[in-house]
């Protein structure tokens, strides 16, 4: 999102060690931000397996997003119930679709909702697109960044539970920095070409090694760069924020 992104020396070493350990994952965006937005809403507070099932059931039951928008909410609930919190997520999805419809009508657009959202994001910078998504009902900073990164290959860095925890332990950010604040910090220090691989590798590391409880420090490739075990001094490595 920023014009100039300068990683700290500590982050450079962390990035290189993560790549050595987990490789350099490549993004394969589908350029369907509306599908990605709905999918991200469905993924909240559930497993990938359950959210994928809910998404497939939703698009099988309702062929278009206009159909989802116009359907009785209880029918949406029925379609996505396998993903959990269906009563909440159904309303959020329809609220987003109705808001996009209102914007579309105000502009006199006749494209599909999927095309409308794609065009709205395409004509904006990454930062502007992130702010635009944040203004949609129920869309937080992580959801907005996920859509931009995964679906459009934009350099927006989502901060999920794993990324937040691992980043604090490594000393990339301060221990009191919230996930919302971390979005802005990573925006300043992560080069665009690093965004996707760093995000994916931090999640991988959080799932495999740096668990919330009983992290496997004796198996950690980042042991030499970790504030949690005292290998680095947080005051010298964290970015102010």
Segments and roles (model prediction):
Residues 3-240:
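Catalytic cores of DNA base-excision repair glycosylases
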């Amino acid at each position: 999102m920023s014009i100039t992104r300068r990683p700290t020396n500590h982050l450079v070493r962390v990035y290189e060690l993560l790549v050595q350990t987990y490789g350099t994952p490549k993004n394969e965006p589908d350029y369907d931000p509306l599908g990605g937005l709905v999918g991200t809403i469905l993924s909240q507070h559930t497993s990938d397996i359950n959210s994928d099932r809910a998404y497939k059931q939703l698009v099988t039951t309702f062929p278009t997003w206009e159909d989802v928008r116009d359907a009785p909410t209880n029918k949406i609930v029925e379609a996505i119930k396998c993903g959990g919190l269906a009563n909440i997520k159904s309303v959020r999805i329809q609220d987003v679709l109705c808001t996009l419809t209102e914007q579309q009508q105000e502009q006199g657009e006749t494209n599909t909702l999927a095309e409308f959202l794609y065009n709205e994001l395409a004509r904006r910078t990454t930062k502007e697109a992130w702010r635009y998504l944040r203004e949609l009902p129920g869309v937080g900073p992580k959801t907005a960044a996920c859509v931009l990164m995964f679906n459009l290959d934009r350099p927006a860095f989502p901060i999920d539970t794993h990324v937040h925890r691992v980043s604090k332990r490594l000393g990339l950010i301060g221990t009191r920095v919230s996930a919302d604040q971390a979005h802005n910090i990573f925006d300043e220090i992560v080069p665009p070409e690093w965004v996707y691989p760093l995000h994916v590798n931090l999640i991988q590391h959080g799932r495999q090694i740096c668990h919330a409880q009983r992290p496997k420090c004796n198996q950690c490739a980042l042991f030499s760069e970790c504030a949690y075990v005292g290998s680095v001094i947080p005051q010298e490595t964290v970015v102010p924020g």
